[in-house]
Amino acid sequence: MRPIGRLAALALIASLFPLLAGNTSAHERRAGGSHTGLEIPAISHGEMAVIADYRGEIIALASRAVDTNEPFRRVLNYAEIQYSYCVWGRMPGSVTDEESPFNECAHAYLAATKAVLMAMREMPREATAAGEIISAIDIDMARRGLALITCQFSGEAFNTAQVVKPNWSRVPLHPASMASLTGLAALFGLAGLVFRRVLRPKAQSSE
């Protein structure tokens, strides 16, 4: 999705926030999700911070892969779907702040991204590039001292049959998320007013 489209989607989410907050529970997973999906290993809080920096490169490499199997494609698809559920990683603190209402869903898409990267180590055409990314991640983690950092979601495994949603009901308790969504809602409202004013003279002149 292009940046403008993502901004519009964020603004729409912000405008619908009261409805979302009223109808979702803490880190609610999709109702009725089966347990027949593929399990995705947990990711530590420290790993998240580094893998988030390499996510675009990992997904781009995976998307170009030709000789893939169904499990790989399912995990890749889950990583991208979960990323959109987590507002494309745009919410402040979603990766680094354990208290963020978006932290668990960030764990989900980054755990899936890591699983995709690990799978590419065994793929003939992608193995070299995947190995280079893994080495860079290992170096970054050691340099930043993130290897042993954990949080409440660090031991949580995920499943491709279950989408992790943000904890909308906790957004008002998280200042950074609340400020971001409030600002986007205000921007969306202002854009609507400007659009109406631009159209009004044209409508009057056509009468």
Task: Place the predicted regions along the sequence by residue.
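Short, aromatic-rich amphipathic segments at membrane interfaces
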Residues: 150-180
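Soluble mature domains adjacent to a membrane tether on cell-surface and organelle-surface proteins
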Residues: 25-161
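Cytoplasmic C-terminal tails of single-pass
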Residues: 200-207
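Selective detector of the "anchor" transmembrane alpha-helix that sits immediately C-terminal
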Residues: 171-200
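Hydrophobic secretory-pathway targeting helix
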Residues: 1-38
